[in-house]
């Protein structure tokens, strides 16, 4: 595969976007070792623009390096490359993390146009969502709603509903629904985000932290402190691996301070299920025993048993079958 670094880059990107960090790192290593001066499939003179874009996507060294990598990718890849829109999205996210909100917003706007032109619908959906979050930050709720309507339309058109990064769209939509007083829609958006959250990992760390920050904001507004605390713990775990994420680090700290001011009266429920527990939940509906599930997930029997009992407790049930039934009723599992 080192003889085909472009294929390795694509494999690394797919692994990252679907929440598989170890696989993404493995393919990235193969791509880097196989880097050649031969042209890339999009007509770029070498594979370096693709590698630069991959490094930007993974953001292993913070927003400054991400910005440099994204600029290199955008500057050196072939004109009209189908990856130009992806490079613009990475540029926008790097500027956002650096606190350059206005610049980021303009780049997100450019990305939507580029993404639609080349069929990069996931990028367009994410860019529209980021514009919605920036609008929320300005208090422009109606504008945020319009951006989210467009993002949802793109997601539905391209069948992206089950794609992990779309979790951030649901987190933003939950906030808009909460502002509008639509409790049923709030619950629906939070449930969708919860189903996708386990697969939004440190493979793409800025999205992983952002999803948890935006969900924590919503749960905190609902006074569900147990859920907010769970999300901030997960954000901390990601930041231990990728500590340099600009404004997202500050947002986690601000939310933690806000959470400390709230009297903790909420009892951990389904909303407080951890990402690990949400990953286990679908396997509880299979014929596999807990030890067999442990083998499937490369976890010890004790770890799986502990996670399963934690799920039962948070769902308020006493058995595996009851947990599966109740999770399906909540929308966390397919019926």
Residue locations for each model-derived region?
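Inter-repeat boundary and helix-capping residues of tandem alpha-helical solenoids
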Residues: 1, 41, 45, 81-83, ...
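Conserved positions within tetratricopeptide repeat
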Residues: 5, 25, 67-68, 105, ...
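Helix-turn-helix repeat elements of alpha-solenoid scaffolds
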Residues: 19-34, 59-72, 99-110, 141-150, ...
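Linker/hinge segments immediately adjacent to helix-turn-helix/homeobox DNA-binding domains
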Residues: 188-192, 205, 212-276, 282, ...
């Amino acid at each position: 595969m080192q003889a085909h670094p472009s294929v390795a880059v694509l494999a690394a990107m797919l692994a990252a976007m679907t929440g598989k960090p170890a696989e993404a790192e493995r393919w990235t290593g193969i791509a880097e070792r196989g880097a050649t001066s031969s042209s890339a499939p999009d007509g770029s003179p070498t594979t370096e623009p693709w590698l630069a874009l991959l490094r930007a996507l993974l953001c292993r060294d913070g927003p400054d390096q991400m910005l440099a990598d994204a600029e290199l990718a955008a500057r050196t890849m072939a004109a009209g490359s189908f990856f130009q829109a992806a490079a613009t999205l990475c540029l926008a996210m790097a500027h956002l993390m650096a606190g350059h909100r206005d610049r980021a917003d303009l780049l997100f706007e450019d990305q939507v146009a580029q993404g639609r032109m080349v069929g990069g619908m996931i990028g367009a959906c994410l860019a529209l969502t980021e514009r919605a979050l920036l609008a929320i930050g300005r208090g422009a709720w109606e504008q945020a709603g319009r951006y989210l309507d467009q993002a949802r339309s793109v997601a539905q058109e391209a069948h992206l509903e089950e794609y992990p990064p779309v979790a951030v769209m649901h987190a933003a939509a939950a906030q808009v629904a909460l502002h509008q007083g639509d409790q049923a829609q709030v619950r629906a958006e939070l449930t969708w985000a919860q189903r996708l959250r386990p697969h939004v990992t440190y493979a793409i760390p800025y999205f992983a932290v952002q999803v948890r920050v935006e969900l924590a904001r919503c749960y905190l507004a609902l006074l569900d402190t147990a859920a907010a605390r769970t999300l901030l713990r997960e954000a901390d775990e990601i930041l231990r691996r990728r500590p340099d994420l600009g404004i997202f680090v500050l947002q986690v700290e601000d939310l933690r301070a806000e959470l400390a001011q709230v009297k903790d009266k909420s009892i951990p429920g389904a909303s407080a299920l951890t990402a690990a527990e949400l990953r286990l939940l679908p396997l509880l509906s299979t014929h596999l025993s807990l030890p067999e599930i442990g083998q499937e997930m490369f976890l010890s029997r004790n770890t799986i048993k502990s996670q399963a009992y934690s799920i039962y407790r948070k769902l308020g049930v006493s058995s595996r079958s009851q947990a599966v039934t109740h999770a399906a009723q909540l929308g966390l599992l397919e019926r």
